[in-house]
Amino acid sequence: MQQLQNIIETAFERRAEITPANADTITREAVNQVIALLDSGALRVAEKIDGQWVTHQWLKKAVLLSFRINDNQVIEGAESRYFDKVPMKFANYDEARFQKEGFRVVPPAAVRQGAFIARNTVLMPSYVNIGAYVDEGTMVDTWATVGSCAQIGKNVHLSGGVGIGGVLEPLQANPTIIEDNCFIGARSEIVEGVIVEEGSVISMGVYIGQSTKIYDRETGEVHYGRVPAGSVVVSGNLPSKDGKYSLYCAVIVKKVDAKTRGKVGINELLRTID
């Protein structure tokens, strides 16, 4: 694996010179191997190690290099045709392979090659970008978007129209992460490498980026870039220092544990916020 990483790192340093016409065989094979490993879930752009999320920047570099070495090509797609550098993940799937991998794909859901989809996942008409990782038992609902390199945990529900931000550039940026057993309400947006920790519930229409204040009304604490585990979050406002105006924020209205979540439905958690 180290040799593969070295090839990617070296090629990335001269990426401006690389074109589909002049890409050397070693680089091309290395990039294609990484994309295949991402596609199968053998590698992932970010993973939790000793309780901390670690981003493997060299894998992002490989994804970016894939855009340099590949030319646009016509892509067949049922009622339409497309023209892009990245093939579709399911282009060569037959019924046997779908059965073996054990997930459902509802037309016209689109998944790019280099994204991993785990067993028992359901993809309604949605979009999953290259480098993304969608773990077991997750529902990606209608018109939801999973951005490039985003990491989605087990048993997550991404409701209709949810946007999970992608991150290929800037290179140092970390991917957006939704941990296990989270619920993201309809039309919410989680972007810019924000981490929603395990068991959290995000209400409908909540927008969270790195600069969004995440206010815990029980403690008065303000978080940035991270929703603590077990949080129930709704959209809200905080007053300015001079009291003349208010600015948007996300509000943690309560904390719940796994036992409570098991007994109480998502709708009840969101409706009883007083």
From Swiss-Prot:
Keyword check for Repeat: yes
E.C. no: 2.3.1.117
Subcellular location: Cytoplasm
Gene Ontology biological process terms from the UniProt entry: diaminopimelate biosynthetic process; lysine biosynthetic process via diaminopimelate
One Pfam match: Hexapep_2
Catalytic activity: (S)-2,3,4,5-tetrahydrodipicolinate + succinyl-CoA + H2O = (S)-2-succinylamino-6-oxoheptanedioate + CoA
Coiled-coil intervals: none
Annotated positions binding substrate: 104, 141
Keyword terms of this UniProt record: Acyltransferase, Amino-acid biosynthesis, Cytoplasm, Diaminopimelate biosynthesis, Lysine biosynthesis, Repeat, Transferase
GO MF assignments: 2,3,4,5-tetrahydropyridine-2,6-dicarboxylate N-succinyltransferase activity; nucleotidyltransferase activity
Pathway annotation from the record: Amino-acid biosynthesis; L-lysine biosynthesis via DAP pathway; LL-2,6-diaminopimelate from (S)-tetrahydrodipicolinate (succinylase route): step 1/3
HAMAP family xrefs: DapD
Family, per entry: Belongs to the transferase hexapeptide repeat family.
PANTHER family: 2,3,4,5-TETRAHYDROPYRIDINE-2,6-DICARBOXYLATE N-SUCCINYLTRANSFERASE (PTHR19136:SF52), MOLYBDENUM COFACTOR GUANYLYLTRANSFERASE (PTHR19136)
Protein name: 2,3,4,5-tetrahydropyridine-2,6-dicarboxylate N-succinyltransferase
